[in-house]
């Protein structure tokens, strides 16, 4: 029953419930900001044995950009996504910076990095509370909670004071909402009526629900921090080829405004997000057994020198088959995009600088093609990118901050590093990354202030547009490795390719039929209720594909369509 703990196996790890169902399950659409996602799985005796990930919306930005001024790229590519818009602006700007050969000033690097830090904090808070937590939290079970008991639990896991009155107010508001019969985003949620895959007790559900509401208000602060230097959010307007345009970012007033918003956001991360993550993770330790992948790639992030990836606070690296004793250096020439199973002309794998975007829609699985996404590969292998890749590689490289936070999380949960290769590990890594970046923003901010105090007020460098050039911009966005690739011809965009985190993780098979990370991660996932496959969505959501709208689940035996809302 929802709100009750699952039966525990020896060692205190819950036994994950599963059904005896065999047949297909289709979740369509699983939507996100970049487009729509369709997940199709084959289940045998209650476990997933095969999976297909399909992006069902054509984007076509690469086609739109051809023939335009390279400086305009950032304004178009930001519209790829309404959440992490700045990362695309940064990737496009770095891409053209690289093509024209300009070295940007120190202050510009600091300002770009600070806005990116705020972007990370905003994205990861929103993901945990509003896109992923409700795969684990039963909001309606919070109505059964004792607010006084819940307040004691909250105070035991966080230094923040939480009163019974505060939680009672949330519970009363929730009760009124439920009794109205108009559940809005919770209509037909998986947990309504109870679901065996939800384990949290009522008090923990009440605490999480209260923090869900608080995070709605808090994420505005992180977004505002981005706008302090970025002019607005979403779709910032301060990056230009050669640096930034925001001269007011040099003033004490604007710096103080950013600093105040960062401090408030960091306090929430330290006192709310991380404690909540640890409580949820402790209850769902069985999810350290599912959702893992083998290959990882990160471009690293927060550079001192834009031209040196190894100057980044997080270093780049590549790992195959979980061999973290043998971290490979990143080589941009080893990236290829495969289209054999995508709705594009041809079947040849191409490096992004030679990439083509020529649509060829068949139908679902016609000619074995089933997605508008291409399939990026590194040395021919599918690679997971994102917080888990960045944390695992940084940990293995001996990154002191990452090691300290990761070891503390693992010790608190009583598990070893191997537990990170999982759905739960991916979710925990996002929290670890958030905590490390939240602290590092303060370090960067102080360095920026010190640099200004030395009399440096330069924020942009001059440059000239070449007739012919190639460039690439690498950003480790909140969802992972993002790269923009440009070929300039006669001073205009001759070709432009975006290789985004979601194509790395959520793309289709390649020409060698190797599954993408999300497809591979779903194999072996238990499903307790085929009509409410929350387990599938736990793993899909752990990659952070911004879920927002309605979903249909098709029963393979009856062809009955079950409609419900992703939470």
From Swiss-Prot:
Indicate which residues the UniProt annotation says bind Ni(2+): 81, 84, 546, 549
Is-annotated flag, keyword Iron?
yes
Residues binding Fe cation, per UniProt:
84, 549
The EC code for this enzyme is: 1.12.2.1
Pro-peptide positions?
553-567
GO MF assignments? cytochrome-c3 hydrogenase activity; ferredoxin hydrogenase activity; nickel cation binding
Q: Name one GO cellular component term.
A: periplasmic space
Listed Gene3D superfamilies: Cytochrome-c3 Hydrogenase, chain B (1.10.645.10)
Cofactors demanded by this protein = Ni(2+); Fe cation
Q: Which reaction does it catalyse?
A: 2 Fe(III)-[cytochrome c3] + H2 = 2 Fe(II)-[cytochrome c3] + 2 H(+)
Q: Which residues bind Mg(2+)?
A: 62, 498, 552
PROSITE patterns, sorted: NI_HGENASE_L_1 (PS00507), NI_HGENASE_L_2 (PS00508)
Instruction: Quote the subcellular location field of this record.
Output: Periplasm
Q: Which family does it belong to?
A: Belongs to the [NiFe]/[NiFeSe] hydrogenase large subunit family.
Q: State any further remark.
A: Perhaps the leader of the small subunit serves as a transport vehicle for both subunits.
Quote the subunit structure annotation: Heterodimer of a large and a small subunit.
Relate the protein's function as given in its record. Answer: Catalyzes the reversible oxidoreduction of molecular hydrogen, in conjunction with a specific electron acceptor, cytochrome c3.
- This protein is called Periplasmic [NiFe] hydrogenase large subunit
Origin species, per record, is: Nitratidesulfovibrio vulgaris (strain DSM 19637 / Miyazaki F)
């Amino acid at each position: 029953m929802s709100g009750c703990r699952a039966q525990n196996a020896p060692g205190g790890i819950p036994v994950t419930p599963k059904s005896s169902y065999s047949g297909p399950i289709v979740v369509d659409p699983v939507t996100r900001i970049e487009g729509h996602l369709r997940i199709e799985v084959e289940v045998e005796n209650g476990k997933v044995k095969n999976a297909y990930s399909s992006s069902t919306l054509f984007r076509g930005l690469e086609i739109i950009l051809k023939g335009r001024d390279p400086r305009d790229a950032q304004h178009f590519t930001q519209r790829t996504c309404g959440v992490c818009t700045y990362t695309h602006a940064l990737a496009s700007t770095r891409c053209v910076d690289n093509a024209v050969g300009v070295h940007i000033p120190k202050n510009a690097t600091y300002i770009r990095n600070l806005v990116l830090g705020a972007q990370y904090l905003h994205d990861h808070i929103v993901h945990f509370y509003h896109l992923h937590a409700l795969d684990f939290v039963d909001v309606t079970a919070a109505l059964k909670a004792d607010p006084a008991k819940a307040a004691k639990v909250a105070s035991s896991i966080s230094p923040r004071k939480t009163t019974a009155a505060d939680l009672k107010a949330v519970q009363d508001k929730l009760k009124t909402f439920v009794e109205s019969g108009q559940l809005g985003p919770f209509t037909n949620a998986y947990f309504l009526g109870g679901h065996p895959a939800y384990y949290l007790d009522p008090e923990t559900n009440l605490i999480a629900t209260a923090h869900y509401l608080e995070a709605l208000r808090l994420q505005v602060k992180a977004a505002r921090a981005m706008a302090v230097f970025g002019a607005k959010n979403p779709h910032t307007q301060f990056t230009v080829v050669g640096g930034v345009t925001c001269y007011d970012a040099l003033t004490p007033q604007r710096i103080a405004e950013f600093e105040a918003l960062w401090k408030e956001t960091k306090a929430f991360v330290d006192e709310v997000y991380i404690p909540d993550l640890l409580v949820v993770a402790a209850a769902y330790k069985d999810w350290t057994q599912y959702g893992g992948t083998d290959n990882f790639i990160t471009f690293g992030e927060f550079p001192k020198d834009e031209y040196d990836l190894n100057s980044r606070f997080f270093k780049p690296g590549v790992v195959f088959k979980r061999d973290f004793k043998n971290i490979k250096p990143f080589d941009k020439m080893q990236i290829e995009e495969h289209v054999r199973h995508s709705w594009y002309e041809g079947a040849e794998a191409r490096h992004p600088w030679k990439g083509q975007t020529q649509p060829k829609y068949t139908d679902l699985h016609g000619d074995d093609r089933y997605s508008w996404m291409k399939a990026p590969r590194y040395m021919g292998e599918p690679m997971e990118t994102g917080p888990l890749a960045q944390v695992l590689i940084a940990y293995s490289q001996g990154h002191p901050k990452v090691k300290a936070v990761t070891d503390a999380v693992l010790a608190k949960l009583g598990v070893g590093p191997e537990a990170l290769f999982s759905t739960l590990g991916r979710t925990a890594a996002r929290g670890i990354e958030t905590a490390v970046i939240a602290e590092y923003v303060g370090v960067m901010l102080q360095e920026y202030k010190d640099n200004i105090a030395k009399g440096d007020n330069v924020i942009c460098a001059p440059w000239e547009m070449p007739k012919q050039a190639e460039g690439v911009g690498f950003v480790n966005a909140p969802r992972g490795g993002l790269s923009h690739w440009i070929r300039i011809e006669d001073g205009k965009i001759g070709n432009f390719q975006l290789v985004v985190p979601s194509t790395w993780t959520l793309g289709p098979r390649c020409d060698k039929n190797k599954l993408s990370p999300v497809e591979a991660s779903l194999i072996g996932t238990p499903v307790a209720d085929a009509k409410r496959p929350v387990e599938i969505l736990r793993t899909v959501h752990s990659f952070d594909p911004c879920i927002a709208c309605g979903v249909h689940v098709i029963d393979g035996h009856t062809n009955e369509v079950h409609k419900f809302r992703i939470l």
